[in-house]
């Protein structure tokens, strides 16, 4: 029986660069401190007239083309974002569908913060393998700058904008072997997007995070999660060809990498140039690996992510072909 596979991957990177040196002029921080604590050197910022749906549409068009499909071949669009175009509706997925000229298809958003792309893979795999859908477009798109308080030096240094997309279809070469997702809402107040005026719908939104607590829980949770998904599938860590984690913080990535005893050659790291792009970070990093020639036929790929909610997840993919 054919299994669901990720047939393509693509990304869109905004042109504007916001470097650590630039942030030194905005808040009380230094390049040395940011680099030492996070590994981030710069991040990308979308233009004022670009929304998450615009970023996502540009990545989506590339992903559809790389899958050797046309927009009209897509029968579902799933989007993960914590920075949607609109507060409640319409969904960013519906906006992307409109941008692609598509109607009468399933289109909805998933709210799983930085774990969003793992959740998308799980849902797309289920839709395709059940026979409900044939070609599911999954998009992680973030304009985090739209909800960022650039007076808060503890958080504005971390995030950037961007988008990544892929197409999930039945495939005899590229397989989504397994996906695991989980959550614990008891920690929701440690990382959230807060309303400025709870009594009014006319309010601004800003992200807030208790970084030290999030860091500790993220490292422990991710370390355990990747060990569990490998054990469940009878796979040894040394069999992993490429580890592509959510790009939140270099210290978190390195902690999980060390837990798995993986070499630097097997670990894809892009946080230094993009910052934390939330739901977009994994597909953006995967696209970089593809364009750099690091994705090889037959590769076994491990993904993992942790985000607000708390949510987390991991996935095992087999890259079997040359499609993307």
Swiss-Prot record:
EC supergroup of this enzyme: transferase
Annotated spans, ACP-binding: 247-251
Cysteine disulfide links: none
Protein name: Beta-ketoacyl-[acyl-carrier-protein] synthase III
Substrates-to-products reaction catalysed: malonyl-[ACP] + acetyl-CoA + H(+) = 3-oxobutanoyl-[ACP] + CO2 + CoA
Pathway assignment: Lipid metabolism; fatty acid biosynthesis
Organism of provenance: Campylobacter jejuni (strain RM1221)
GO terms, molecular function: 3-oxoacyl-[acyl-carrier-protein] synthase activity; beta-ketoacyl-acyl-carrier-protein synthase III activity
Gene3D superfamilies for the chain: 3.40.47.10
Comment block on domains: The last Arg residue of the ACP-binding site is essential for the weak association between ACP/AcpP and FabH.
GO biological process: fatty acid biosynthetic process; secondary metabolite biosynthetic process
SUBUNIT field: Homodimer.
Superkingdom in the source lineage: Bacteria
Family the entry assigns: Belongs to the thiolase-like superfamily. FabH family.
Gene name, Swiss-Prot/TrEMBL: fabH
Function: Catalyzes the condensation reaction of fatty acid synthesis by the addition to an acyl acceptor of two carbons from malonyl-ACP. Catalyzes the first condensation reaction which initiates fatty acid synthesis and may therefore play a role in governing the total rate of fatty acid production. Possesses both acetoacetyl-ACP synthase and acetyl transacylase activities. Its substrate specificity determines the biosynthesis of branched-chain and/or straight-chain of fatty acids.
Active site: 114, 246, 276
Keywords assigned: Acyltransferase, Cytoplasm, Fatty acid biosynthesis, Fatty acid metabolism, Lipid biosynthesis, Lipid metabolism, Multifunctional enzyme, Transferase
């Amino acid at each position: 029986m054919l299994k669901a596979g990720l047939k393509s991957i693509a990304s869109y990177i905004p042109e504007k660069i916001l470097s650590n040196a630039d942030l030194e002029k905005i808040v009380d921080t230094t390049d040395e401190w940011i680099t030492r604590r996070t590994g981030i050197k710069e991040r990308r910022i979308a233009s004022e007239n670009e929304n998450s749906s615009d970023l996502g549409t540009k990545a989506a068009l590339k992903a559809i083309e790389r899958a050797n499909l046309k927009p009209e071949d897509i029968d579902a669009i799933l989007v993960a974002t914590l920075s949607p175009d609109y507060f409640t509706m319409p969904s960013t997925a519906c906006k992307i569908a409109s941008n692609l000229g598509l109607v009468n298809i399933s289109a909805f958003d998933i709210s799983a913060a930085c774990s969003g792309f793992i959740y998308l893979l799980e849902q797309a795999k289920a839709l395709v393998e059940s026979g409900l859908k044939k070609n599911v477009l999954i998009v992680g798109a973030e304009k985090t700058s739209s909800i960022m308080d650039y007076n808060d030096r503890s958080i504005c240094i971390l995030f950037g904008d961007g988008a990544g997309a892929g197409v999930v279809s039945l495939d005899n070469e590229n397989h989504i072997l397994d996906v695991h997702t989980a959550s614990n809402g008891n920690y929701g107040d440690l990382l959230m997007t807060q309303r400025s005026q709870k009594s009014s719908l006319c309010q601004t939104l800003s992200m807030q995070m208790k970084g030290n607590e999030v860091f500790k829980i993220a490292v422990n949770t991710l370390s355990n999660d990747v060990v569990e998904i490998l054990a469940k599938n009878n796979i040894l860590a040394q069999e992993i060809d490429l580890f592509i984690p959510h790009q939140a913080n270099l210290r978190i990535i390195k902690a999980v990498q060390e837990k798995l005893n993986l070499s630097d050659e097997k670990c894809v790291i892009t946080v230094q140039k993009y910052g934390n792009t939330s739901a977009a970070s994994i597909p953006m990093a995967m696209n970089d690996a593809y364009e750099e020639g690091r994705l090889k036929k037959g590769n076994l790929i491990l993904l993992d992510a942790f985000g607000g909610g708390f949510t987390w997840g991991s996935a095992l993919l087999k890259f079997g072909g040359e499609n993307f």
